[in-house]
C-alpha cells in the first residue's frame, strides 16, 4: 500500500504539469498580471467571502433537510476514498493549489473555448462542476453556490487566473475552519 500511497501524488503532479503546459502554450495565462491588480484582488476577496458565506448557508440547509444517515454516508465515502491513498499534507496541497488550477482550466477555460454560446458554457460549467463533486446526491445543493461564484468570477473577465484564486481561496478558508473547528 505504501507504494500506491507514494505514487498518486506523483501522478497528480504529472497530470497537473501537462495541463499547465497546454494552458501556457495556448495563451491561457496571457492576462495573468491583471489578476494581481489591487482593485481586482479586492473583488476576488469579495467573491471568496461571499462564496464562503453562501457555502455555509447551503451546508446548514443541507444538514437541516437531508436525513442525517445520507449525509454521513456521502461524506464518509469521499473522505475514506481520499484518505485511503493520499498523505494528509498532499490532500491539503491538492485542495488549495492543484485542484483549483486543474478544475478551473477544465471547467471554465476549456469549457468556454469549446462552447461558442457563453451563457450555455456558463450554465453547463456550473452544473457539471457541481455534479462531478457530488455524484448526483443531495449535496449537489451544498456545492452549487460555490460553483456559481467561481464560474461567475471567470465569466466576468474570462480570466482563469481569477477563478483559480477564488477557488483556491475558498478551499483554503474551508480547510482553515475545518482544522480550527
Curated annotation (Swiss-Prot):
Transmembrane domains' residue ranges: 10-30, 41-61, 81-101, 114-134, 161-181
GO cellular component, one term: plasma membrane
GO molecular function: endopeptidase activity
Similarity remark: Belongs to the UPF0177 family.
Protein's cellular compartments: Cell membrane
Top-rank taxon, per record: Bacteria
Species whose genome carries this gene: Lactococcus lactis subsp. lactis (strain IL1403)
Recorded topology in the membrane: Multi-pass membrane protein
GO biological process per UniProt: CAAX-box protein maturation
Keywords: Cell membrane, Membrane, Transmembrane, Transmembrane helix
Family matches, as InterPro entries: CAAX_protease, Rce1/LyrA-like_dom
Protein name: UPF0177 protein YbdI
Amino acid at each position: 500500500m505504501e507504494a500506491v500511497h507514494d505514487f498518486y501524488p506523483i501522478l497528480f503532479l504529472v497530470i497537473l504539469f501537462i495541463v499547465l503546459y497546454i494552458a501556457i502554450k495556448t495563451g491561457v495565462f496571457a492576462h495573468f498580471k491583471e489578476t494581481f491588480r489591487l482593485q481586482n484582488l479586492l473583488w476576488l476577496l469579495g467573491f471568496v467571502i461571499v462564496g464562503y458565506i453562501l457555502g455555509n448557508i447551503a451546508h446548514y440547509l443541507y444538514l437541516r433537510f437531508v436525513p442525517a444517515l445520507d449525509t454521513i454516508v456521502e461524506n464518509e465515502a469521499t473522505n475514506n476514498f481520499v484518505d485511503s491513498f493520499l498523505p494528509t499534507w498532499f490532500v491539503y496541497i491538492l485542495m488549495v493549489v492543484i485542484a483549483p488550477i486543474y478544475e478551473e482550466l477544465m471547467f471554465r477555460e476549456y469549457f468556454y473555448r469549446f462552447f461558442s454560446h457563453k451563457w450555455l458554457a456558463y450554465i453547463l460549467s456550473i452544473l457539471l462542476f457541481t455534479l462531478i463533486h457530488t455524484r448526483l446526491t443531495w449535496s449537489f445543493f451544498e456545492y452549487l453556490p460555490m460553483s456559481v461564484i467561481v464560474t461567475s468570477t471567470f465569466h466576468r473577465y474570462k480570466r482563469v487566473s481569477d477563478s483559480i484564486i477564488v477557488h483556491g481561496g475558498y478551499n483554503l478558508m474551508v480547510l482553515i475552519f475545518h482544522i480550527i473547528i
